[in-house]
Swiss-Prot record:
The keyword Ribosomal protein does not apply. InterPro entries: C-CAP_CF_C-like, CAP/MinC_C, CAP_C_sf, CARP_motif, TBCC1, Tubulin-bd_cofactor_C_dom. Its main location: cytoplasm. GO terms for cellular component: cytoplasm; spindle pole centrosome. Gene3D superfamilies: 2.160.20.70. Belongs to the TBCC family. The gene is tbccd1. Residues 304-435 form the C-CAP/cofactor C-like domain. May play a role in the regulation of centrosome and Golgi apparatus positioning. The lineage of its organism: Eukaryota, Metazoa, Chordata, Craniata, Vertebrata. PANTHER family: TBCC DOMAIN-CONTAINING PROTEIN 1. It holds the Pfam family TBCC. This is TBCC domain-containing protein 1.
Length: 547
C-alpha cells in the first residue's frame, strides 16, 4: 500500500446476489433486527454466536420474526450458498444432501449448518434496499406488454425493485444513508443504550469492522489492488482518521463512521464503470434496419479477477456464440435482446436476463443466481445454483438446479422442463462452479409472492412436448451425455419418438423404391422440412449459424 487516498465502495455481490427481489418481511425492520442482534449475542452457547446455526435461526425467524419455515430456509440457504460455501464445500453438500435416506436425516444434517452471525444480520438488513416507498414515482412502464392490464400492488413493487440490485448509486446511497444503523446493529447490546448520548465514547471491536467487510471493500493504489475493509481500517497511515486504537485493538464509533463516509465512492468495478469505460467487444453483428446498435462491453481486462462483468445489449436477429476467458467467473447482464440465439458456454458467476423477447439463451453453469425479469417468450437452458423469475410471460426454462426455482411476482405462463443439452466441457465447467447433477429441484418451484394461488403462473412441460436440444458447436472435453440424464417420463418420450423414426426409416428402406421414386421422395421430404424450418423460425437460426 502506498500513500494514496483510501477509497471505499459498496460491494456488488451482496446486493446483486443477496437482496431478494421482493419487499422484505415487515419484521426485517431495524427495530426487530436490533432485537435479534441482542438476542443472539446473549445466547452464544446455544448456537447463536459467533456462528448462527440453522435450528436457532429457524427458532428466531418462525417464533419471533413470524415468517414461515420455507422463507426462513430461503434466506439462510441463499446466504450460505452464495457467500460462505467454497466450490469444494458446495460439491460435498450436494453429495450429502442427495444421499440422505430420509427427510428426518436431512433435517438432522441441516441442523449442523451455520453462518457467520454478524454478516448474516447485515444480509437481512440489506433486504431493506427493496423496501417500497409509496412516495417514490413509478418511472418504469411494463415491458414487454403483450396485453393491457392495470398495475397490481406486486407490479408496483417490482417496478421499484428491479433496477436497484444492479445500480451502483443505489448501493452507495444505501451504505451512506444507513451506516449509523448498520454499525448499531453490530454493537454489543450494552452499547446501544448510550449510542445517542455519547457516541464519541463508544468503541467498535475489530470483529465488527471485519463483519463490515461483507458490504464494503476498497483500495489505496487507484484500483490496482482491492483490499479487505479491516486491512484498510487498521492501516497505519489512516489510523487517526479511522479511529483505530492499537492498544485496545478497537475503533472509535464516531471516527470510524466519519472516515467511511469521507472515503465512500461509487464502485469503480460496477456496471456503471463497465458501460462507461469498459472494453467494447465485437462479438455481435450490426443488423441493418435496426434503430439501436448491438453492444457488448466488459471490464475483464481492467479489474481484478473477482470483479469481472460482461454487459450485452440490443442483440437482435442473429446467433451469438462464445466460450471465452472473458466470461469465466463473470457477472453477466443480457439486456433488451430480441429474436436471437445466444450461447455463452463458459462457467459464469451470475447471470441476469432483462427485458428480452423471442430469444433462446443457452448458458454455461451459473455458480450463483440466474435471474430472469421482464421477459417475453424467452427460452433459457442452464445449470445454476438458483433460478429466480420476476414478471416473465410465456417463458420456458430447461433447468438443472439444487434449489427450488424462485418465483417472484408478475409471472405468467412459465414452463419448467428438465435440462436437456450437453457440450464437451459441460461437466468440467460444472465442477469449476460447484454444481452437481443431484439434488435437482427443477420441478418444485417456490412461489414467493402474493399470487401463489394463481394456476396460470407455471406448469410442467408435458413429456410429449419435450425434445432434446443440440448445441451446434464442437469443443474439446469429455462430456458425452446430458449430465444426470432425463427424468423417466421425458426419457421414455424421447425413446418412443426415436423408435417411430427408426420404424419409418425401415419402412422406407423396405419399400423397394426405384431410384427415380427415391429422388421424388427425397424432394418431398426436403420441401416439407424447409416448410417446417420456415414455420418454426428455425431457418433464421441455421442461416445465422452459417454466417
Amino acid at each position: 500500500m502506498d500513500g494514496s487516498r483510501v477509497q471505499l465502495w459498496a460491494k456488488t455481490d451482496p446486493f446483486l446476489l443477496g437482496a431478494l427481489q421482493m419487499p422484505p418481511p415487515a419484521k426485517f425492520s431495524m427495530h426487530y433486527l436490533r432485537k435479534m442482534a441482542s438476542y443472539v449475542r446473549t445466547r452464544a452457547t446455544e448456537g447463536c454466536y459467533p456462528r448462527l446455526y440453522w435450528a436457532m435461526w429457524r427458532h428466531i425467524a418462525c417464533g419471533k420474526l413470524q415468517i414461515v419455515e420455507e422463507t426462513a430456509w430461503l434466506y439462510f440457504e441463499t446466504f450460505l450458498s452464495v457467500f460462505e460455501r467454497s466450490v469444494a464445500q458446495s460439491l460435498d453438500w450436494a453429495e450429502v444432501a442427495s444421499t440422505c435416506p430420509s427427510s428426518e436425516k436431512y433435517e438432522e444434517i441441516k441442523s449442523q449448518l451455520s453462518v457467520d452471525t454478524l454478516k448474516f444480520i447485515l444480509f437481512l438488513y440489506i433486504q431493506q434496499i427493496n423496501k417500497i416507498s409509496l412516495r417514490a414515482p413509478m418511472i418504469e412502464s411494463e415491458w414487454p406488454s403483450p396485453r393491457s392490464r392495470s398495475p397490481t400492488p406486486d407490479f408496483v413493487a417490482q417496478s421499484s425493485i428491479y433496477n436497484k440490485v444492479w445500480d451502483d448509486y443505489s448501493h452507495y446511497n444505501f451504505i451512506h444513508n444507513h451506516l449509523t444503523y448498520i454499525l448499531e446493529l453490530l454493537m454489543e447490546p450494552k452499547q446501544l443504550s448510550i449510542v445517542t448520548q455519547s457516541s464519541h465514547c463508544i468503541l467498535i471491536s475489530a470483529e465488527v469492522v471485519n463483519a463490515l467487510g461483507f458490504l464494503i471493500e476498497g483500495t489505496v493504489d487507484k484500483n490496482r489492488a482491492v483490499n479487505h475493509f479491516l486491512d484498510l481500517a487498521v492501516w497505519q497511515p489512516v489510523q487517526i482518521k479511522s479511529g483505530f486504537i492499537e492498544t485496545s485493538g478497537a475503533f472509535s464509533f464516531q471516527k470510524l463512521q466519519a472516515w467511511i463516509k469521507e472515503c465512500l465512492v461509487i464502485n469503480p468495478f460496477g456496471i456503471t464503470a463497465c458501460i462507461k469505460s469498459g472494453t467494447k467487444l465485437s462479438w455481435a453483428q450490426q443488423v441493418d434496419g435496426l434503430n439501436k446498435r448491438a453492444k457488448v462491453a466488459c471490464n475483464t481486462y481492467k479489474v481484478p479477477h473477482t470483479h469481472r462483468m460482461v454487459v450485452m445489449s440490443q442483440i437482435s436477429k442473429q446467433t451469438l456464440a462464445k466460450s471465452s476467458k472473458t466470461l469465466v467467473d463473470a457477472r453477466v447482464k443480457i439486456h433488451r435482446c430480441s429474436d436471437c440465439y445466444i450461447y455463452l458456454l463458459s462457467p459464469l458467476r451470475s447471470v441476469t436476463v432483462e427485458k428480452c423477447q423471442n430469444c433462446t439463451i443457452i448458458l454455461g453453469p451459473v455458480q450463483t443466481v440466474l435471474h430472469i425479469q421482464m421477459c417475453y417468450n424467452v427460452k433459457i437452458i442452464a445449470v445454476c445454483q438458483r433460478l429466480s423469475l420476476l414478471s416473465t410471460t410465456n417463458c420456458t426454462f430447461h433447468i438443472l438446479t439444487p434449489t427450488r426455482p424462485l418465483f417472484y411476482c408478475g409471472n405468467q405462463g412459465a414452463v419448467l422442463a428438465p435440462f436437456h443439452i450437453r457440450y464437451s466441457m459441460l461437466e468440467d465447467h460444472m465442477a469449476q462452479t460447484g454444481l452437481a447433477t443431484v439434488p435437482n429441484s427443477w420441478d418444485r418451484p417456490f412461489l414467493f409472492s402474493t399470487e401463489s394461488n394463481n394456476s396460470n403462473i407455471w406448469r410442467l412441460m408435458p413429456p410429449e412436448d419435450f425434445f432434446t436440444f443440440v448445441v451446434p458447436f464442437e469443443m474439446e472435453g469429455d462430456t458425452t451425455e446430458i449430465p444426470g440424464g432425463l427424468p423417466p417420463a421425458y426419457s421414455n418420450s424421447v425413446q418412443q419418438r426415436q423408435q417411430k423414426i427408426h420404424t419409418w426409416q425401415k419402412t422406407v428402406k423396405d419399400a423397394g423404391l426405384t431410384r427415380e421414386q427415391r429422388k421424388q421422395f427425397q424432394a418431398v421430404v426436403e420441401m416439407k422440412f424447409n416448410e417446417w424450418l420456415s414455420k418454426t423460425e428455425n431457418r433464421h437460426q441455421l442461416d445465422s449459424l452459417v454466417s
